[in-house]
Amino acid sequence: MKQLLDFIPLILFFITYKLGGVREAAIVLVVATILQIVILKWKYGMVEKQQKIMASAVVFFGLLTAYFNEIRYLQWKVTIINGLFAIVLLVAQFQFKTPLIKKLLGKELQLPEKAWNTLNLGWALFFIICMLVNIYISHNMSEEAWVDFKSFGIIGMTVIATIISGVYIYRYLPKDGSNSKDGEK
């Protein structure tokens, strides 16, 4: 239910854009995002920090898009958010010597430090690629192509990155059903 709720604002944005246009779609996106946060708070008692950041960015850039009737503000949001995610992952790894992915998943998975570092770098690279693809599409393709990319392309890229991560992690999982703490074979 929680994951489905994450996609509702995006789906409503896409449908409204196709039926109405940029301004209407941005307004629907902002309202749906605010409702999403209210529902999450009501149903689960809390909203995760990442969701608050994303919702704030959607509201800010969505309102700019609606006010100016110009999609470039939402295009900037995608670029900025992906860039920030990449920077945070890289700074955590190289400045603080702590792969952020380990902080997020370390309770569920036991992996060697080298694997956490590789996974963290992989996701940083993923966010950089998303940022660069977004810049390319927003500057060189039609507005409609960008909306399609934003609605489905990034989701597809995320699914592929998740599968690659899963395949990478699988090699470190215990093969005999034991709960090895070091994650080594």
UniProtKB/Swiss-Prot annotation:
Domain of life of the source: Bacteria
GO cellular component term, pick one: plasma membrane
Keywords: Cell inner membrane, Cell membrane, Membrane, Transmembrane, Transmembrane helix
Keyword DNA repair among UniProt keywords: no
Membrane-crossing segments per the record: 27-47, 53-73, 76-96, 118-138, 149-169
Membrane topology: Multi-pass membrane protein
Compartment(s) where it occurs, according to its Swiss-Prot or TrEMBL record: Cell inner membrane
Pfam families listed in its UniProt record: IspA
InterPro entries found in the cross-reference section: YciB
Similarity comment: family membership: Belongs to the YciB family.
Functional description taken from the UniProt entry: Plays a role in cell envelope biogenesis, maintenance of cell envelope integrity and membrane homeostasis.
Protein known as: Inner membrane-spanning protein YciB
Organism from which the protein derives: Haemophilus influenzae (strain PittGG)
